[in-house]
Design a protein with these regions (language model features):
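N-terminal Sec-pathway targeting helices
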Residues: 1-10
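Histidine (H) residue identity feature
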Residues: 22, 33, 46, 70, ...
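Electrostatic cytochrome c docking/interface patches
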Residues: 14-38, 136-148
């Protein structure tokens, strides 16, 4: 009986370790894709370290706000996944218009350049850079917004 318990415990441990390695490999691949896509499509405005543009909370001469940071000092983590996906896909002005807000945002839409999986990879990369508190808050916002 002791042998059976040890065999079952060993099998369970191997399964858990295997699942953890699979998840880590998947997350590592997602992170790498997300980082590469962020660098190619977002970093020029939002910064290579997610730092955003200087004075991002004050409109420029054109009336538009500079690109905000996507790190914990910004407000990206205040929004649900659905809102972030809409903003990236449609662009700022159109996404805001669909929420009933009129604002000439400088954020272009990437729906014609990036597919849904690529946008998700970018968001996963951005989220991976946040402290636990911000990730938890954003996950709660997403859950309260229907899980998207």
């Amino acid at each position: 009986m002791k042998t059976s318990i040890l065999v079952l415990a060993g099998a369970a441990l191997v399964g858990i370790i295997g699942a953890a390695l699979h998840i880590s490999a998947r997350d590592g691949a997602t992170w790498s894709r997300g980082r590469a896509l962020y660098d190619a499509n977002c970093a020029a405005c939002h910064g290579g370290n997610l730092e955003g543009q200087p004075n991002w909370q004050s409109p420029g001469a054109d009336g538009q706000l500079p690109a905000p940071p996507h790190d914990a000092t910004g407000h990206t983590w205040h929004h649900s996944d659905a809102d972030l996906i809409a903003y990236i896909t449609l662009g700022g002005a159109e996404a805001l218009a669909q929420m009933g807000v009129t604002y000439d945002s400088g954020m272009p839409g990437y729906g014609n350049q990036l597919n849904a999986e690529e946008i998700a990879d970018i968001l996963d990369y951005i989220k991976s850079r946040w402290p636990e508190r911000e990730r938890r808050y954003q996950a709660e916002r997403t859950a309260s917004d229907g899980g998207q």
